[in-house]
Amino acid sequence: MRDFQIRELSRIAELAQPSVTNHLNALLKENLIIKEKKGIYPTFRANREDEMFKFYKKMDTLLMLKQTGFLDYIYDSCMPDSIILFGSASKGEDIAESDIDIFVQSPDKKLSLEKYEKTLNRKITLLFEENFSRLSKELKNNLLNGIILRGYLKAF
C-alpha cells in the first residue's frame, strides 16, 4: 500500500494544493483514507479496512467491467447461465497486482481477453464450468459469496 504526500497528489491529479487538501479532508472525514505524520509532511493512503472503501472499490470494479464491454463480450461469446465475479475483487480487497476472477457457467471457450486486460490494467482469469455440481465445495462457497454479474446461478 502506497503513501502519498499532498504535492505528489497535486501533480497526479493536476489540481492546486489547496484543492487537493480540501478533497483529502473530505475523504478523511468519511474515514476512506488514513493520514500519518512521517517526517515533516503528512502522508495519506487508502483505508483498505473501511467497509465503505471496500464498497466503493467493488462498485468501481463492477462499473469498469460493464463500461468496457467485457460483460457483453463474455455473454455474447458464451451465452452462459451465469457470470460471477469472485475472489478478492468481489470483496473490494483487491490490489493493483490482483487478477480479476470470473466464473462463466458455460462450456469452456477460448476467448481473447487482451483488449480488456489492457483497458482494465489487470489480468483476467476465467473459470468455465457448465455444471455447478462438479465444482469443489470451496469453489462453490466462493462463487455463492461472489457477485452475480449476469444471469443467475442454479446451485441446487
Description of each model-found segment:
Residues 1-81, 90-97, 105-156:
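Catalytic core of pol beta-like nucleotidyltransferases
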